[in-house]
UniProtKB/Swiss-Prot annotation:
Record InterPro entries: Ribosomal_uL6-like, Ribosomal_uL6-like_a/b-dom_sf, Ribosomal_uL6_a/b-dom, Ribosomal_uL6_bac-type, Ribosomal_uL6_CS
Higher taxonomy: Bacteria, Bacillati, Bacillota, Clostridia, Eubacteriales
Gene field: rplF
Superkingdom of source: Bacteria
Protein name (database record): Large ribosomal subunit protein uL6
NCBIfam families the record matches: L6_bact
Native species: Clostridium kluyveri (strain ATCC 8527 / DSM 555 / NBRC 12016 / NCIMB 10680 / K1)
One cellular-component annotation, GO: cytosolic large ribosomal subunit
Assembly description: Part of the 50S ribosomal subunit.
Key words of the record: Ribonucleoprotein, Ribosomal protein, RNA-binding, rRNA-binding
Role summary: This protein binds to the 23S rRNA, and is important in its secondary structure. It is located near the subunit interface in the base of the L7/L12 stalk, and near the tRNA binding site of the peptidyltransferase center.
Length: 180
């Protein structure tokens, strides 16, 4: 049995959870609603304020989908109750971010400013000129948008310039020593 998959998911008060016969899960909460189609090989049942995920057989594919399905449903429940956020930090001379409506405009050392439109379900905040906070209820979407923004200028190992996650540690390298 999957260590993650066998754990039941508690449904908090104020959250409605529904499953259709073809395994489409809908979770509604105070922050919004998420809908996701799950694998057909997995059984999803609601038993007194908790969701139980089971599998039909012990094939390798079913075993791998068991824990995944449970984790995805748990992420949906947490998303509609608390939401998710990722913080990015801009490090470098002249690297700045600002909001223009729903658009994030960043100066990253290119000859032009980088403009990123907020996708539906994601909001941007700039608490400081060098910090960007991405918020939303879908963990996957928030992570993908943060990764897209980071990909414009990944942190480099010599000076540490670039866009990094706030909890990311950049491995630094020694520069050339030169002739002696």
């Amino acid at each position: 049995m999957s260590r993650i998959g066998k754990l039941p998911i508690a449904i908090p008060a104020g959250v409605t959870f529904t499953v259709t016969p073809d395994n489409v899960v809908t979770v509604k909460g105070s922050k919004g609603q998420l809908v996701k189609a799950m694998a057909k090989d997995i059984n999803i049942a609601v038993e007194d304020n908790s969701v139980v995920v089971t599998r039909n057989d012990d094939e390798k594919k079913s075993r791998s989908l068991h824990g995944l399905t449970r984790a995805l449903i748990n992420n949906m429940v947490v998303g509609v109750t608390e939401g998710y956020s990722k913080t990015l930090e801009l490090i470098g001379v002249g690297y700045r971010a600002q909001l223009q409506g729903k658009k994030l405009v960043m100066n990253l050392g290119f000859s032009h400013p980088v403009e990123i439109e907020a996708v539906e379900g994601v909001t941007f905040e700039t608490p400081a000129a060098t910090k960007v906070v991405i918020k939303g209820i879908d963990k996957e979407l928030v992570g993908n948008v943060a990764a897209d923004i980071r990909s414009w200028r990944k942190p480099e190992p010599y000076k540490g310039k670039g866009i990094k996650y706030d909890n990311e540690v950049i491995r630094r390298k020694e520069g050339k020593t030169g002739k002696k």
